[in-house]
């Protein structure tokens, strides 16, 4: 599941405009299914797949909550600069 977040910041005293775009996805499940017996075992689920809509919090593959899946954030920052007008 991917989410996209766009943040635009603009400073009044500056001539720089910064735009940031983040893609969030949830990859392999890290839930320890053997924690109650003192061991360590994961289920092998490689990627979170929402059961139901995109906003579902349960994985269709392993049945775990989304928080058990490792979160990856890819952020892209774009800065645009326009020099001050020399005629002012």
UniProtKB/Swiss-Prot annotation:
UniProt name for this protein: Mini zinc finger protein 3
Gene name tied to this protein: MIF3
Zinc finger (ZF-HD dimerization-type): 26-72
GO molecular function: protein homodimerization activity; zinc ion binding
Keyword Nucleotide-binding in annotation: no
Tissues of expression: Mostly expressed in roots, stems and flowers, present in seedlings and leaves, and weakly observed in inflorescence and siliques.
Function (record text): Inhibits zinc finger homeodomain (ZHD) transcription factors by interacting with them to prevent both their nuclear localization and their DNA-binding properties. Involved in integrating signals from multiple hormones by regulating the expression of specific genes. Promotes the formation of ectopic shoot meristems on leaf margins.
GO cellular component, one term: cytoplasm
Record's subcellular location: Cytoplasm
Lineage: Eukaryota, Viridiplantae, Streptophyta, Embryophyta, Tracheophyta
Keywords: Cytoplasm, Developmental protein, Metal-binding, Transcription, Transcription regulation, Zinc, Zinc-finger
Subunit organization: Homo- and heterodimers. Interacts with ZHD3, ZHD5, ZHD6, ZHD7, ZHD8, ZHD9, ZHD10 and ZHD13.
Pfam families: ZF-HD_dimer
Organism: Arabidopsis thaliana
Superkingdom as given in the UniProt entry: Eukaryota
GO biological process, alphabetically ordered: regulation of meristem development
């Amino acid at each position: 599941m991917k989410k996209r977040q766009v943040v635009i910041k603009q400073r009044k005293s500056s001539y720089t405009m910064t735009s940031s775009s983040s893609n969030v996805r949830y990859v392999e499940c890290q839930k320890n299914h053997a924690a109650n017996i003192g061991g360590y075992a994961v289920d092998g689920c490689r990627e979170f797949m929402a059961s139901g809509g995109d906003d579902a919090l349960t994985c269709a593959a392993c049945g775990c909550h989304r928080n058990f899946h490792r979160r990856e954030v890819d952020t892209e920052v774009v800065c645009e600069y326009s020099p001050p007008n020399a005629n002012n």
